[in-house]
Amino acid sequence: MHKEEHEVAVLGPPPSTILPRSTVINIHSETSVPDHVVWSLFNTLFLNWCCLGFIAFAYSVKSRDRKMVGDVTGAQAYASTAKCLNIWALILGILMTIGFILLLVFGSVTVYHIMLQIIQEKRGY
């Protein structure tokens, strides 16, 4: 009878003792660039004197687009312009709204006094 021989290869220590290699991935944190879209939308809807709110809204959208593309410098430039326009829109909007209300009140009081004088003259006082 013929015997077959089987060879067993020795592979070394078990794989659990081999240390795995580590890979380091550097993820750059995005610089937070506020685009002021909500503030611009508020100024557009409620304080849009001289169309500054609408222009600020356009710059805010451009800032958001630049941020989505990855152009942080361009996004910051558009955001800075939008912020400046929003400040001016807010200041002018508040001042012109107060001025309009004062003009309306004083105009109404003046018309009331003129009408009162006309009524008194017709009655013969």
Swiss-Prot record:
Expression across tissues: Bone (at protein level). Levels greatly elevated in colon cancer, cervical cancer, esophageal cancer and ovarian cancer. Expressed in glioma cell lines.
Residues with PTM Phosphoserine: S16
Interaction with CAV1: region residues: 84-125
Posttranslational mods: Palmitoylation on membrane-proximal cysteines controls clustering in membrane compartments and antiviral activity.
BP-aspect Gene Ontology terms: cell surface receptor signaling pathway; defense response to virus; host-mediated suppression of symbiont invasion; negative regulation of cell migration; negative regulation of cell population proliferation; negative regulation of viral genome replication; ossification; positive regulation of osteoblast differentiation
GO CC, one annotated term: protein-containing complex
Presence of keyword Ligase: no
Expression induction or repression: By IFN-alpha and IFNG/IFN-gamma.
Record lipid sites (S-palmitoyl cysteine): C50, C51, C84
Transmembrane segments: 87-107
Extracellular side: 108-125
Residues on Cytoplasmic side: 1-36, 58-86
Entry similarity comment: Belongs to the CD225/Dispanin family.
Function noted in UniProt: IFN-induced antiviral protein which inhibits the entry of viruses to the host cell cytoplasm, permitting endocytosis, but preventing subsequent viral fusion and release of viral contents into the cytosol. Active against multiple viruses, including influenza A virus, SARS coronaviruses (SARS-CoV and SARS-CoV-2), Marburg virus (MARV), Ebola virus (EBOV), Dengue virus (DNV), West Nile virus (WNV), human immunodeficiency virus type 1 (HIV-1) and hepatitis C virus (HCV).
Protein name: Interferon-induced transmembrane protein 1
Origin organism lineage: Eukaryota, Metazoa, Chordata, Craniata, Vertebrata
